[in-house]
From Swiss-Prot:
UniProt GO BP: threonine biosynthetic process
GO cellular component: cytoplasm
GO terms, molecular function: ATP binding; homoserine kinase activity
NCBIfam families assigned: thrB
Family named by the database record: Belongs to the GHMP kinase family. Homoserine kinase subfamily.
Function: Catalyzes the ATP-dependent phosphorylation of L-homoserine to L-homoserine phosphate.
Gene3D superfamilies linked to this entry: 3.30.230.10, GHMP kinase, C-terminal domain (3.30.70.890)
Protein name per UniProt: Homoserine kinase
E.C. no: 2.7.1.39
Chief localisation class: cytoplasm
Species in which this protein is naturally found: Staphylococcus aureus (strain NCTC 8325 / PS 47)
Positions of ATP binding: 90-100
């Protein structure tokens, strides 16, 4: 097979404050993969951006590992492949870079192993590997999605929510924050009353989004009790960014995923001025407007 598989895979932001490990939204920053068979004796990698050049090129490569895991599950053998990669999703910043790579790996195994997975099956596989659907679901489908993974039945359920009519700003620090380190900051247990309170806030926030009530949704996004209070101290710039966003009447300022990126829901009439203020005042970060992605992963076959 000499055909080339081309994948364009969006970034994602998870949690939206109170939707811990459940809610995610796709963003227009992308991992681009171009994959074809090689006559070599092992998988080959060509990286076109500096961040990707940090990645391993042996069997510990994440895409290789996941693709082989999927191939093994369906009892198929994959040929040796050459993967060209370019990404504008920063690594370990809370923008779903690992979820994008995971989804890409499943698509690679599916095509070159001729597995014929449905998109529903891709979601089930991705969530089983990832452990929760908050990043992988919007990466696959696009848009804003709430989901739940039942780790007993191994079944994932998702619900699509209307795209918010807001401008999205991401403030990206220069440093990484590994998900594992961010999760270590979380408590092992919450009291029953704490869990009930946070669940009620999350439920109401989702309803507010569905009703396009961004004032209420934003207010509730900032009242999380599951993870934000335990992670904010890991992000030195969080309080300053939130203060500046509030001065520009933003709807909400929350941690994107496990951090350190900070996500802002902004009023459209204020977003440009807000981004410029953030870039002039919070010089240790880069802030930018980013569109909500509505397409999810895109697959294209180039026949040769």
């Amino acid at each position: 097979m000499s055909n080339v598989l081309e994948l364009t895979i969006p970034a994602s932001t998870a949690n939206l404050g109170v939707g811990f490990d459940s809610i995610g939204m796709a963003l227009d920053k992308f991992l681009h993969l171009s994959v074809k068979e090689t006559s070599g004796t092992k998988w080959e990698y060509i990286f076109h951006d500096d961040a990707s050049k940090q990645l391993p090129t042996d069997e510990t490569n994440f895409i290789y590992h996941v693709a082989q895991q999927v191939a093994s599950k369906y009892s198929v053998d994959l040929p040796n492949l050459c993967i060209e990669m370019r990404s504008d999703i920063p690594l370990a910043r809370g923008l779903g870079s690992s979820a994008s790579a995971l989804v890409g790996a499943i698509y690679i195994a599916n095509y070159f192993g001729d597995i014929q997975l449905s998109k529903h099956e891709v979601l089930q596989l991705a969530t089983e590997i990832e452990g929760h659907p908050d990043n992988v679901a919007p990466t696959i489908y696009g848009g804003l999605i709430a989901g739940y993974y039942n780790d007993v039945s191994k079944e994932t359920s998702v619900a699509h929510i209307d795209i918010p009519d807001v401008d999205v700003i991401v403030t990206i620090p220069t440093y990484e924050l590994k998900t594992e380190a961010s999760r270590r900051a979380l408590p092992q247990k919450l009291t029953h009353s704490e869990a009930v309170k946070s669940s009620a806030i999350s439920n109401t926030m989702i309803c507010a989004l569905a009703q396009h009530n961004y004032e209420l949704a934003g207010k509730l996004m900032q009242q999380d009790g599951f993870h934000e209070p335990y992670r904010q101290h890991l992000i030195a710039e969080f309080d300053e960014v939130k203060t500046i966003a509030s001065q520009h009447n933003a709807y909400a300022t929350v941690i994107s995923g496990a951090g350190p990126t900070i996500l802002i829901f902004s009023r459209k009439e204020n977003s440009g001025e807000l981004v410029r203020s953030l870039n002039s005042q919070v010089v240790s970060c880069h802030s930018e407007l980013v569109d909500i992605n509505i397409s999810g992963v895109k697959e294209r076959i180039v026949y040769q």
